[in-house]
Amino acid sequence: MPRQFPLEKTRNIGIMAHIDAGKTTTTERILFYTGKVHKMGEVHEGTATMDWMEQEQERGITITSAATTCEWKGHRINIIDTPGHVDFTVEVERSLRVLDGAIAVFCAKGGVEPQSETVWRQADKYRVPRIAYVNKMDIMGANFFNVIEMMKERLGANPVAIQVPIGKEDTFRGIVDLLTMKAIIYVDDLGKVSQETDIPEEVKDIAEEYRIKLLEAVAETDEEIMVKYLEGEEITVEELKAAIRKATINMQMTPVLCGSSYRNKGVQPLLDAVVDYLPSPVDIAAVKGFSPDTGEEIERKTSEDEPFCALAFKIMSDPYVGKLTFLRVYSGVLHAGSYVYNSTKNKKERVGRLLHMHANHREDVDAVYAGDICAAIGLSNTTTGDTLCDENHPIVLESMEFPEPVIQVAIEPKTKADQEKMGIALQRLAEEDPTFKVSTNHETGQTLIAGMGELHLEIIVDRMRREFKVEVNVGKPQVAYKETIKKSVKVEGKYIRQSGGRGQYGHVWLELEPLERGAGYEFVNKIVGGVIPKEFIPSVDAGVQEAMQSGVLAGYPVVDVRVTLFDGSYHEVDSSDMAFRIAAAQAFREGMKKADPVLLEPIMKVEVVVPEEYMGDVMGDINSRRGRIEGMELRGNAQVIRAYVPLAEMFGYATDLRSKTQGRGTYTMQFDHYEEVPKNIADKILEMKNK
């Protein structure tokens, strides 16, 4: 089956916004007008097509980015709907990485909200061209021009209106197209019937003013238009469109449109703008990667004639077909049933079926081509961020960076039956989400799950219950402390049992020394002259490591210690591996008590981005959390504060920051190093732990 749509007529776009700007409703309307859905879903009724996980329908927020294909005016548009909540930034990062362009949706009343700033910065990082859509023009307090000002101030963007609204709040009834200088008035409720008329008197002046602003903005980016504009020559609609397209793709401007998706007004012009101004896969630079054999940089152009390469950007478990791997094909062709090479893992895999996804139903295809987004079934070893390619022309594409999880809670199954299912459920969920990690606490045997925030873990537990029918009890969030020593000591350990029959005899002298942070554990054997036979040395090492699993202060793991075995003795008959293990473990515990043991805590590298006016409050708050401020810089028109703060002090920070900055501050944090806990705080922790 040959390609249905030429590459130039393909658009891979994302719809990104702050929570509640009306992003999912906008996607719904797009699917309705492009003929993919026959009845529109409403988010507040819980029937929106893109929100197909049960939790999303209940909470009315989008958690995973569902990928959908639709058609408009002879173009294929692949849409990825992304979540707007800060705990799910991994979903946004991962979809932006594989998109060519995006629609940024803003609420006409709220304008540029905190998550819009975060998402905008992520899109800047991946250089994704955007058009902006000011939604909810029909609500109280809607102000289109105000949003444009906010985009300049808060995002440092260059927004250029290509439409102005006719009426606002409950009188909003249409838009003026500033390219054709015609009005589009909506007649029916579904917005399918619209009339093109002359511009109504009440908006004539503002339309003229913004037409001039549009021409000036375009002239600044295009030499030919500049000349025509200055000489007062006529600039055709076609010339304007071409110049706006070029400036948008080069990230010199962001065209701004308006509408009310819920009232079905302004959605078709938005679709036209996607086709007119956002890039096709041909318009973007060739994708770069490196050769797994030589390490040299290679690139692949977006073309079917190039060797095949694709990036796996999302894994999903589907109740009917099992594991779905979402792929962005950058070059070449992939046929269903063929073999591909996973260059990240150095493994060959067979692709069973290839699907084009609609939000919740799917269509099988024989092949996918450069520029396509699709889902594959049958890739068992592939995980998020892996490169798939032609084995004869291997390439590894730049993977995605995912932050380390920062919060962990203990979970336990409610019943014996839940226990078996829990392991499978956790493995599946960890496969899907690179920011979700599972581990076991060796002392308590508890299962710990770690993620990006409390909502993130809440939803994971919720999904375990619904999708895998596993009920679990959840503990409180906790910090992973460790223990170490501050001075060197020499210590003797003896384990002797000699009361009839075969006895036990182990005797060691150890020296314990502190090492620098992050050095781990070192074992040095200085036995000479065979005072302890060679075969017992590994047992001494094993005994020490066993004792290090649980420190003397509060049972936390011990790190950064060098242990030297320098003397001891043995018995011809009674010495054994077990005896030396026990002697070494006793010696280590004894020695650690004398070596000035201390508690270590994880220190996080925190970056807080806040508008200037909240800076004093936020810095004061960081200091009160035992934070050390490292530096500040201006980014756009926000202040960036960099600091090191103990993880123990960061619980609940998201909520505090939100209230201190009226929701405009955002922060990221990642683990940096371990550091000694101040004595007064260590005493409190030990008191709690040893109760």
Curated annotation (Swiss-Prot):
Cite the tr-type G domain residue spans from the record: 8-282
Sum up the protein's function in the record's words: Catalyzes the GTP-dependent ribosomal translocation step during translation elongation. During this step, the ribosome changes from the pre-translocational (PRE) to the post-translocational (POST) state as the newly formed A-site-bound peptidyl-tRNA and P-site-bound deacylated tRNA move to the P and E sites, respectively. Catalyzes the coordinated movement of the two tRNA molecules, the mRNA and conformational changes in the ribosome.
Q: What is this protein called?
A: Elongation factor G
Q: Which domain of life is it from?
A: Bacteria
Q: Name one GO biological process term.
A: ribosome disassembly
* Species name: Caldicellulosiruptor bescii (strain ATCC BAA-1888 / DSM 6725 / KCTC 15123 / Z-1320)
- Main localisation: cytoplasm
- Extract the PANTHER family matched here: RIBOSOME-RELEASING FACTOR 2, MITOCHONDRIAL, TRANSLATION ELONGATION FACTOR G-RELATED
GO MF annotations in UniProt: GTP binding; GTPase activity; translation elongation factor activity
Q: Which PROSITE patterns does the annotation name?
A: G_TR_1, G_TR_2
Task: Say if the entry is tagged with keyword Chaperone.
Answer: no
Q: Which family does it belong to?
A: Belongs to the TRAFAC class translation factor GTPase superfamily. Classic translation factor GTPase family. EF-G/EF-2 subfamily.
Protein residues bound to GTP: 17-24, 81-85, 135-138
